[in-house]
Amino acid sequence: MGRIIGIDLGTTNSCVSIMEGNTPRVIENSEGARTTPSIVAYQEDGEVLVGASAKRQAVTNPKNTLYAVKRLIGRKFTEKEVQKDIGLMPYSIVPADNGDAWIEVRGKKLSAQQVSADILRKMKKTAEDYLGEPVTEAVITVPAYFNDAQRQATKDAGRIAGLDVKRIINEPTAAALAFGLDKQEKGDRKIAVYDLGGGTFDISIIEIADVDGEKQFEVLSTNGDTFLGGEDFDQRIIDFIIDEFKKDSGVNLKNDVLALQRLKEAAEKAKIELSNSAQTDINLPYITADASGPKHLNIKMTRAKLESLVEELIERTIAPCRVAVKDAGVSVGDIHDVILVGGMTRMPKVQEKVKEFFGKEPRKDVNPDEAVAVGAAIQGQVLSGDRSDVLLLDVTPLSLGIETMGGVMTKMIKKNTTIPTKFAQTFSTAEDNQPAVTIKVFQGEREIASGNKALGEFNLEGIPPASRGTPQIEVSFDIDANGILHVGAKDKGTGKENKITIKANSGLTEAEIQQMVKDAELNAEDDKKKVEFVQAKNSAEAMVHSVKKSLGEYGDKLDAGEKAKIEAAIKDMEEALKSDDKAAIEAKNAALMEASQKLGEKMYADMQSSQAAGGDAGAAAGAEHAQAKPAADDNVVDAEVKEVKKG
């Protein structure tokens, strides 16, 4: 089995980690950063940019630069959270044929899974570059409060990216693994993981116990809000700036996508700066223009103002904390440590609110940006069999059940049940001679089924005629370690059964996933060709530059015919460089190398004679001559010979 990497697929930033022995290592990306912006840009020429390069060009390409796509994954277009985002995002969110929320980019519809796969592919490549070997297996984290559809969609994104997702684990649980593994305190400890990221909020109460030398991490409860995070904080700042600018200039920036993209960057920057200073300037020259000329934006913002804008958002995190503590069967005083995860927890007001609720200072020895990826890597090591001193007992975040007579939700597995788990219950028919039953599966806490998230439905057919209440239909629920649900129904009288892995009544079909995997592989082939073309072009341009330089220095030593031949080869090469034809560039490059061979010989002979002439010119020249001697060796590179100066 190869190495299993740990990936934190975040709303705003993503991170990848690997275990080296028993030490986790967060891997720097190609730009040298330990986290990668979860931003994907689709260029006109078909190139896909991911991370910092996508972020840099967002202002000039707002409609085709996608961020915070995690907020759409596994969601229906009609959900109120999606409808809210439609009015805020510069890119186009559209309904897919199956009812999911997809994104339209350059006339093409993309699922949130495909866009997430582009980010995962970047994480995979980051790990491969570091390890120097292919990576095919990963543990990917999701918010603890993600429902079944969102978990399944994340797993599908991994498949599209070419990864075998060995486990989906909850972000707070991963952070607890990263925190608790190296702690030497004896006895059981209860910790609260408060995870406020770019798009989601989770709170988990976790017990870390030493059981016969094994660290056992048991999730006691979890709660949260999958549509609350840093993006919402940014939006409050953007709305404030728009209102202030409208008051000052009379211009409304709400419908100007270029201005909105600049405002988003400025809001994020101001939010970060105000975590460390009491005031910041938001300065955006030439933000827009009207008949009177260009307009400049300059607004001072204090930390107090920011806190007043986002106070209600921070307050919204406290109710889930209260529920999680109650569901865990503990009191706030029983909690030993509070861990903060997610970039938003750097905000002083957030830390203050957490301290106020839990009655203790949150721990400062956990990196909020990296802990989740580190925990995923630890779980990867456990799954690969390289570690046996860790046991992770996670829970299902929401109750699961089926719709029964009168539209009631009959709960089969209650929220915060440790997974994996199985449960079966016997039901009967509602009408006489009913030939089939439809099993409708829901996830949520409402008593009426329609108030919960519909996960899917299937039929059990061929029930023999009988009066209502006679047939015995056993419905079984089985949640695997990824938190993904499998449901079965069996007629006890006939032995007939039907089983499905619940895929949301939206979600991607197997055929769609296969097609997306194929598309991704084709893109990878295109990317490879692009890189090879760029390398050929760079090599040819370097050759032209080198030969031109040498021709200027030694051209007078060649006869006219040879010189003309080289000049013609240079001209051919320059013409080829104007095209996108890699084969032509390589052919002309080879021709130029051949044509300039005589020039190389003249240069070499000239150097030899100048070195011989300088042979008696004292110790310094002798030393230079000694250094130059290896040039006679067959392994000498042309470029190195050219660097030797004439005596």
From Swiss-Prot:
Comp. bias regions, Low complexity: 612-630
Region described as Disordered: 606-647
Pfam families to which the protein is assigned, alphabetical: HSP70
Keywords of the record: ATP-binding, Chaperone, Nucleotide-binding, Phosphoprotein, Stress response
Induction context: By stress conditions e.g. heat shock.
Protein known as: Chaperone protein DnaK
Molecular function, one GO term: unfolded protein binding
Cross-referenced SUPFAM superfamilies: Actin-like ATPase domain (SSF53067), Heat shock protein 70kD (HSP70), C-terminal subdomain (SSF100934), Heat shock protein 70kD (HSP70), peptide-binding domain (SSF100920)
Taxonomy, superkingdom: Bacteria
PANTHER family: HEAT SHOCK PROTEIN 70KDA (PTHR19375)
Signal peptide positions (record): none
Positions of modified residues (Phosphothreonine): T200
Classification via HAMAP family: DnaK
InterPro entries: ATPase_NBD, Chaperone_DnaK, Heat_shock_70_CS, HSP70_C_sf, HSP70_peptide-bd_sf, Hsp_70_fam
Function summary: Acts as a chaperone.
Similarity comment: Belongs to the heat shock protein 70 family.
Xref: Gene3D superfamilies: 1.20.1270.10, 3.30.420.40, Actin, Chain A, domain 4, Substrate Binding Domain Of DNAk, Chain A, domain 1
Record keyword Ribonucleoprotein present: no
